Amino acid sequence: MKVYPTSKIRNIALVGHGGTGKTSLTEAMIYNVGTTKRLGKVDDGNTVADFYPEEINRKITISTSLVPCEYKEHKINVLDTPGYSDFYFEVAGSLTVADTMVMVLSANAGVEVQTEIIWHDYPDMPKMVYVNKMDRENADFYKSLDDLKNNFSENIVPVQLPIGVEESFKGVVDLITMKAYIFEKETGKVTIEDIPQDMSDDVETYKEALIEAAAEADDDLLTKYLEGEELTDGEIKKGIKEAATNGTAVFVFCGSAINNIAVTPLMDFIVDCAATPEQNQLIKGKDIENEPLAAQVFKTIADPYIGRLNMFRLYTGKLKAETTLYNSAKEKDEKIAQIIIMTGKEQANVAELYPGDIAAVAKLNVTSTGDTLTTKANPVVLEDIKFPIPTLSTAIEPKSKGDEDKLSGAIQRLLEEDPTIRVEKDAVTKQTILTAMGDTHIDIVIEKFARKFGVDVITKEMRIPYRETIRATVEVEGKHKKQSGGHGQYGHVWVKFEPFTEENFLFEENVFGGSVPRQYFPAVEKGLIEAMEEGVLAGYPVANIKATLYDGSYHSVDSSEMAFKMAARLAFRKGMETAKPVLLEPIMNVEVEVPETYMGDIIGDLNSKRGRVLGMEPAGKYQVIKAQVPLAEMAKYTIDLKSITQGRGKFTMEFAQYEEVPAQNADKIIEKAKQEKEE
């Protein structure tokens, strides 16, 4: 592949709801420039962009693909992103390095949930809209246009109008050139004609809106327009380009990607009018070729055979192969042996890279997603990429006990690849907990363990890390006495147990007259700490207890540290049983962000989960509900929230404190724990 200067590079991210045809649009673009000899189809499993088995089997995109498209002496770096919410982190990474988002809509569905979410999360990014699937039943371009205008405050302006609809859709009227473009299915061959007579009224209306949008992007043009002067074609094009790059208008296109109808006009507009790398807000106004080198990794691919691939955008400076760069996040040098241009899974090397381009590098030692690669002499640190926080947890374990080390290695590799996976070993339940973005995400992770790393993994219900404590103060005796020839065992203690909220455990001694020699105090404390690992109600760890050793007795020959440890354990058991033991559960601070229309349903659902709503505050068009909810009730909240809000809500939660479990709930937990023990 050629090396392209910055001015000839366009970085676009295809985004939108799942199933709108982003991958089909990518395939049509690369087919039109001759990268492929046949038009790849998602249903046939032969696309360049979707190449993982998990994608081919499900017919969905789960991982962003970089597919460069060489067109009219330019390189369009197309980032084909997933549309399903479980893989939103891929969208976040891609929109960090793209200069323009192309929002893809289905003409028969209009604005869908992920469209709303992405638009809401990236309000300042230059946008275009491609209304796809114009050939489908119930396709309606004008309804989609109204949907966009009703949902978003931006100036939504069509650049094209469709010729025909559903099965009769065959092309578009271009409001810039004022010509009709009729396309041959699949080949994309175009015939240019005059505008159909029956479209003249619509064309006139929308052409005027286009001219107005062009004028509003430039003060001189606006003055001329408001004074009633006619703008020239050159001035209109200049204004459209300004509006497209600074985001004052969102231009709308239409077509059928799967049939390759009206794809090249979008490509022409991207080349002619989309923001160039120099116009990226991060570097606008800088001499980017001569600035200190700065690149950011936005995606990592962990492959068991070729190792790790880091995909990055070069923001400033010029990069050559066989260069040593400096990872400013990790403060380590990294050798860039080769600069790799990815086309789906295919790789090609280039000798150098100009600022603004997107590429990959293999076999870096410490670099991960979000890191900045720069020079040691002039280090730069770019802002971290904001990835969504995973919220759905499950316990995992290898199907074969002998694969535990293998699973551990596989987890480390997948953590490199996916910033929205968390894996932790729960100290209380002894389970390995995988937290991800949703149930589909978890399924994909399990499949990757098997396919990439050869380890079969099963999921289990996540156990809640309950604790036990006491509510009363008691004084109890613990005596360990054993005689079996020779030295016996003798330890005898009196211990006072009382509730203590300041910390998990406090041990004090208040022994007078040497009834228990000082040398055995540590053994008593150790015995109590060991005993606290398992409470008397359901076998959960014990917390928030103060223990005071105040009396006892010893034997000059038979007493030992072990004997006093055993005496302490006996005292603890007796004390727990008589000091009104209770079960404690983890309570989480929860923040739920939803459109206002769902407020009542969300509050009702949180109340049904034994939650306490603490307050609400606005966040733009959304409301944030703050609550405290038991962890036991939040296990499937990711799925519940998606169901209640049709995917429009999101939430975060973090540990707040432990609180007593209500009696009716505690009885069920204790009974379940007993059954599990018997099994």
State what each model feature region is.
Residues 1-679:
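Structural and coupling elements of P-loop NTPases
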